[in-house]
Structures are given as structure tokens and as C-alpha cells.
Amino acid sequence: MKRNGIVSALCFIGFLAAEAPDISVAEALVLLSILFFVPGIFPFVFRQSPVRAAQFMENGLIQCYPVAAFFAVLALVTEVGGFALIWWMYTVFNALYAILRLWETKIHRIEETSVLFGLIYLAGGGFWFFAYAAHLQIMQFGPLIILLTAVHFHYSAFLIPIFNGLLGRTIRKHRMLYSWITWVILLSPLLIALGITYSKTLDVIAVSIYMAAIYLHAFLVFTAAFRTKTGTFLIRLSSAVLMITIAFSMIYSFGVFRQEVTLTINQMIWIHGFVNAFGVILPALIGWRIEDAKPFDADSVKTFSRIYGKRKIGEEFLANIQAENNARYSGLVDDMGSLRSKDFSPEKLAPLILSFYEQTIEYNIKAKVTWSTWFRPLAIIYEWFSRRIGQIHLSTNPDWYRMYSKIKGVHSKKDGRERVRAWIRTNEKNETIFTALYSVYRSNGEGYMNISLPLPFSSMTGILKPYHHQEKLVLTSRRRKSRAGDEGIYLQTRAGTCPLPLSETFLIEAVHDNKLTAVHHMWLFGIKFLTVHYSITHINQPIERT
């Protein structure tokens, strides 16, 4: 990194000396990002992937950066546009690296997606820089507009998503608001570009939405708990200045829409360019380097099932994945002690709860499904689809009904997890309610229940953390306020894995010597939509379907 700093400083001094006294402020701004801000984000992005191909690309990008940056300077000093092609190709490889990370990552956390999208947008900046240096004619745009577009993609389109991602690594509250803000920030550069090209009205709308997102982003910055006073001051200063400069962008866009000159382009270069560089980007870079925000999943060892469903799941789905050695399991968990952590001591649970999870086949189950009022119209449609798919088939009938269950071994090599077993539950009509693939694992000293539900050409995985509460068992996917831990509900496809806006909690309680009750709550976007009550009875010979 020190080498990059020295090379960048020498290149920038050389550019200023060669161009003086007629130095283009816009050219200086784009070089400022190329020479200082691009290498400045390397610690936030690189050295964070276990994928060998990504690590190989990281090393190449770090080693090749000084050469690519040098050719970018040459392109402006010599006016040989071909030199800018080197920088463009370098940014393209950064984008390919980001796409590889997105493709290979196990969990598509919204904050990490935001960081990587910044690298993808940088490739757009590389293209517009090449277009300017090579004097390409693009639509009706003049050279200055092309250069300013390159500046835009080397600044806000590139760096704001990265800073937003770093904020996502830090905040513990308002996660839903953060997700919406992030998607606006990620999509706004495209909407603004379309507006500038095709529609002044769209441009005003896009800038307005982007401005609202930036102001809400500032709210999160000013309510976030940072580690250091210096980092807090610099990051909040950056956010405050950004609120001012984005307001000037709104004024400029509105003037273009009304065909009235409110601010000239030269004024915008100083306000939106120079001030952003030294009042927004530089403080944020220094502040985030001090904070050193790490990804939530940096130390996670979570694994996901490699088994995906077909068009129909049902009980027959298990034919291809049943264990080759016909392994037999009597419970969902071999030993509840494998889930032990500082928050969970199995010996503090009622013995009957331990018995149920370790000897599940010795219990009969009845269930009662209650959909929240607001969700009932959707539940009717959902029931129709779930019956045909044969998975997560929950009735709209509010009455109690019996569940017939059995446990079968699953081929662990095909699944990718250890000691996997399927818990199959059917109703009195012989319709499959659930086919759930159970496993347990440990990560960072904590045990988790890993439950995979095969879906058509995908799977949904619930990673549940256990807690003891008096003699009751709590299993939940809801993330802790500290954002530590692996718990959550995830959708996995061959394209990758992403968290879902779902959460669930089970509360299991022993009410008699041979009877348990369980309550299963589910939330969508934090709003409860489902409650399932279970009555679980221990008998020596459970009822089987005849």
C-alpha cells in the first residue's frame, strides 16, 4: 500500500507539472480518484474471500494497479487515448472480481453486495474515462459531459456504495431501513444515467429518490455506534457534507428540467466535484480505515445443503438422496449437548424436551395453524401452490389435525453436511406437509440447528440458535442485536445464497410428564404472519399410517 501511495503521489505531481498552468479541474478530479481513492478502498474489499480464484485475482489487481494508474495519467498528459484502454481493462477486471465474489459467496449480505457493486460501477467509470481520452463520440454528449460522467462513476457511483456497505457492517438497528436505502443507492446511478440520456423528468425523479436515500443514510450514520471518536467525527462529517452537495445536485437537475440556469456546469464541478473529493470522500476513507469495519461472516463456518428440489417435493423426493448405508436415526438430533454454548445448557431443559429431540419417533404430534388476519387472502393462494409442490403445506383450516412423521437417513456426501436426516410429516389426507433435512454444526464456539427445506430448483435453510429459558427451549432464527452469529433464514440456488426477510421462533415447553407444547411464530419483514401450535405426546408406540 505504501508503494501505491508513492507511485500515486509522483504521478499526480507529474500530471500537475505537465498540465500547468492550464489544469483541467475535472481531469484532476478523475485522476485524484484513480490515484488515491481507488487504492484507498483495497483494505475494505480485498483479503476477505476464501475462494482461491478470488484470491488469485486480488493479488493480480494489487500488483497491476501502479501500472494501470500510470497509463491513466499518460492518457491525459500525452492525449494518446489508447493508454486509457489499460485503465479501462483494469477496472473491468475489478468488476469481474466483484462478480466472482458475488457468485461464489455463501451469503449475499446486503452490505457486502453494496461493497462489491462499487467495483462493478468502477468499470463504468473506466469506460467513460477511455471514451473521453480517446475522443469517442457517444450520442449527443460533448467531451466535458463525457469527462464529468467519468468523474461521477469514479466518485459517487463507485465510492458511495462501498461506504454504504461499510456502514452496513457497523449498524445493529434499523436493518430493514438500511436494506431499502441500499437498493436505492445501488440502482440510482442507472436511473440517473437513463434520465440524463433520455428524460429530464426521469432525471429529476431519480435524483430526488437518490437524495432521499442519502438523507436517510445520514440518519443511520448519525445514530450508529462507532468504535472510535475520530472515526465517528470523520464519517459523520462526510455524511453531513454529502447532504449539502446532493442538495445542489437536486437544484441543478431541477434547473435543467425547467430549462432555467440555476447553477452552471463549472459551478457544479467545484461544488459537486471538488467539495465531494475533499469534504466527503477523503474524510470517509480515513474514518472507515480507523473504524476497520469487518464483514459479519468473516469467521463463519456455516454450511448449506447441496440438495435442491424438483418441480414436486413430497415424500418420494427422498428416493435419490436416502443414505446408502441405510443409516437409521431416531431423533432430529443425536445429542442436544452438541448445541451447547454460553447461552444454552441442555441440562437446564426439562428432560422430556431432550427426549423429544433425541427420540422424535417416540412422539405423536397434533398441529393447529393460525394465519394472521392480514395474510389470510395470501394464505389461500399459498395453500393451493404448497399442496401441489408437496412442501411447507400449511392449511387454512383452523382446526387441530394429526401429523404422521418418520425420520430417514440422508446421504451426507450428496447433502454436504454431516449426519443428515429427513423428518417427513404428512397429514390425515396423506399429503406431505414438510420434508425437512436436519443437521447440526458448530461455529465460533456455538451450536446451531441447520434445517434445509428443498424447494423447486432451490432450498430454504433455517439456521436456528438454541436458548434455554427456565426449563423451556427457544429456537430462533432472529439475529442478535450485536449481529453476531449465523442464525437466519436463507434461500439457496445454484447462483448463490441470500438472506430472506423471514424470521421464526419456536418455544417448546413440557406441560406434563409425557406431553409437550410448542409454538412456532413466523415474521415477514418483521410483521407476524403465521402461528402454529403443536401438541406433542410421548408414547411407546407412536401411531403410524395404515
Swiss-Prot record:
Transmembrane regions listed in the UniProt entry: 27-46, 59-78, 83-100, 114-134, 143-163, 176-196, 204-224, 237-257, 268-288
Keywords for the protein's UniProt record, in alphabetical order: Cell membrane, Membrane, Transmembrane, Transmembrane helix
GO cellular component, one term: plasma membrane
InterPro entries given in the database record: YndJ-like (IPR025450)
Tree of life domain: Bacteria
Localization annotation: Cell membrane
Principal subcellular localization: membrane
Name of the protein in its database record: Uncharacterized membrane protein YndJ
